[in-house]
């Protein structure tokens, strides 16, 4: 289950452990509740969807899969 809290963070609850997902410009991070470690991941490690040569005018977008 997930929801966005008042601070704009994405809270993901997995079997009693709450993960807080922080999405900022160019970085993605998450930490557990209670906070143990903050992990910040550059978005460059996520695969970028590549369009075919028939669609050169469309901008590339980053997709994050959970």
From Swiss-Prot:
Residues bearing glycans: 11
Compartmental location: Virion
Keyword RNA-binding: no
Domain of life: Viruses
Main location: virion
TM segment ranges: none
Induction comment from the UniProt entry of this chain: Expressed in the late phase of the viral replicative cycle.
Cysteines paired by S-S bonds: none
UniProt keyword terms in alphabetical order: Glycoprotein, Late protein, Virion
Record flagged with keyword Glycoprotein: yes
UniProt similarity note: Belongs to the asfivirus I177L family.
Protein's recorded name: Protein I177L
């Amino acid at each position: 289950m997930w929801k966005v809290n008042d601070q704009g963070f994405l809270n993901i609850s997995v079997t009693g452990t709450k993960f807080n997902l922080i999405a900022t410009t160019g970085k993605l991070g998450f930490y557990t509740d209670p906070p143990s470690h903050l992990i910040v991941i550059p978005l460059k490690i996520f695969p970028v969807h590549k369009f075919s040569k028939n669609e050169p005018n469309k901008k590339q977008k980053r997709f994050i899969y959970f």
